[in-house]
Amino acid sequence: FIRYIFEKLAGFQHQDNRQESVVEQIKHYINDHLKEDLSRKTLAGSVYLSEDYVSKIFMNVTGISIPSYVASCRMQKAQEYLKYSTFSVSKVALEVGYSNFSYFSKTFRDYTGCTPNEYRNRVTKKQG
């Protein structure tokens, strides 16, 4: 009986490791393709699994949804571009996967508490 319990626990551990591995693959894909469409279908296809399963394990492993993770990665990358590049704000929006500048600005403001231009002005003042 004890052996059976250990075998079951080992199976769960293996499943957890597999899920974590899949989530890491998805995270890498997201970070390598921020400029592109990152729909559930695209991400599921990148790891050859169903959309529902990918969404479920991503939430189980990370505690956040895929769209929330994608938005967070895009906003972090946008902050880097605004701080270290001379790209226009509209170019930054395109580089992080937003074709709609207004939506990018609203999302950025919601994420950081300021507009992209305000953010750039703040961080360049601190550097100067």
Identify the meaning behind each predicted range.
Residues 41, 52, 88-91, 101-102, ...:
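Residues within helix-turn-helix
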